[in-house]
């Protein structure tokens, strides 16, 4: 019984902590963007604007929920809920030593969840019955599918090297040298692919304000918009965590792990404040003509390395 209840309590605590982390990540983003644009950012609610995320949450969830007249009601309603559910479930493959739900196929579970995330965006865009939302949804789907290929290949190359699908093994393999040092190009490709996966600047075509008003979530108000927002920032935090686990290998119980995670999340925000939006055709060329060959080359290199080491043994 204890074995059944403890993972449940652990996962519930994890979800609550992720939610609080997302709340303060939004505050950090607004503050950092404020200082980048030479202004203060939110500083009225609480001490130095510390309670701003909570007042935002109250405001969003108490506003009136509107439903477009010609929308597909059930799909429209469930898409944000499913989106948030997926981005929280994906945290279950976080490599805990207590084996929360950190099963041996954690990498495959991550790939499955990111692939499913495409459907929520597509359904949200389609069921709104708005041209802007549909265009945003289609862009997001094409973009996510393109960049998932390079993400999967990068993960596959490390799996060949490590020989295991469990994220926990990434620590033991990086006790002497971090992967970022001998796979620096792969690290950059991974970071850019993460930006594209989470629909962040400079790849935020799904919600290109200058072209599509707000993209696939244009018809969502109050609670629905808040859920989509939470899902997006939760996936940003998760991608930062994954970057730290794969490339900056550190023990999840050390304080340095959290410093690194905060730094990578800060890089996401920094990129948003610095870079303009990319051109859509160049985004696709980048995925298929630059990232794909690079990650394939590394994959062959790692396979060759593994075969070479095995041949030395026998």
UniProtKB/Swiss-Prot annotation:
Gene Ontology CC: mitochondrial inner membrane
TM segment ranges: 5-25, 78-98, 105-125, 151-171, 176-196, 227-247, 251-271, 294-314
UniProt keyword Electron transport present: yes
Pfam family, one: NADHdh
Cellular localisation: Mitochondrion inner membrane
GO molecular function: NADH dehydrogenase (ubiquinone) activity
Lineage top rank: taxon: Eukaryota
EC top class, as a word: translocase
Reaction equations catalysed: a ubiquinone + NADH + 5 H(+)(in) = a ubiquinol + NAD(+) + 4 H(+)(out)
Family that this chain belongs to: Belongs to the complex I subunit 1 family.
Name of the protein described by the UniProt record: NADH-ubiquinone oxidoreductase chain 1
Organism: Anopheles quadrimaculatus
Gene for this chain: ND1
């Amino acid at each position: 019984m204890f074995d059944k209840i403890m993972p449940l309590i652990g996962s519930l605590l994890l979800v609550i902590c992720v939610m609080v982390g997302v709340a303060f990540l939004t505050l950090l983003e607004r503050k950092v963007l404020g200082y980048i644009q030479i202004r203060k950012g939110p500083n009225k609610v609480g001490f130095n604007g510390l309670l701003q995320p909570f007042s935002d949450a109250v405001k969003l969830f108490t506003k009136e929920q509107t439903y477009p007249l010609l929308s597909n009601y059930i799909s429209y309603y469930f898409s944000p809920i499913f989106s948030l559910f997926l981005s929280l479930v994906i945290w279950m493959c976080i490599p805990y030593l207590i084996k929360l739900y950190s099963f041996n196929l954690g990498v495959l579970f991550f790939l499955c969840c990111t692939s499913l995330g495409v459907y929520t965006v597509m359904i949200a865009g389609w069921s709104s019955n708005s041209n802007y939302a549909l265009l945003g949804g289609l862009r997001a789907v094409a973009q996510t599918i393109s960049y998932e290929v390079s993400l999967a290949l990068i993960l596959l190359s490390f799996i060949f090297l490590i020989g295991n699908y469990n994220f926990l093994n990434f620590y033991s393999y990086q006790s002497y040298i971090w992967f970022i040092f001998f796979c620096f190009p792969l690290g950059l490709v991974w970071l850019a692919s993460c930006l594209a996966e989470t629909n962040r600047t400079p790849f935020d075509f799904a919600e290109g304000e200058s072209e599509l008003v707000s993209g696939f979530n244009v018809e969502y108000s109050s609670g629905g918009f808040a859920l989509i927002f939470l899902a997006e920032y939760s996936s940003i935090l998760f991608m930062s965590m994954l970057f730290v686990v794969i490339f900056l290998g550190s023990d999840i119980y050390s304080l340095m792990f959290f410093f690194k995670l905060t730094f990578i999340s800060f890089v996401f925000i920094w990129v948003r404040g610095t870079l303009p939006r990319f051109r859509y055709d160049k985004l696709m060329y980048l995925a298929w003509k630059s990232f794909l060959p690079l990650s394939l080359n590394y994959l062959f290199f790692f396979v060759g390395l593994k075969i070479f080491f095995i041949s030395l043994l026998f």
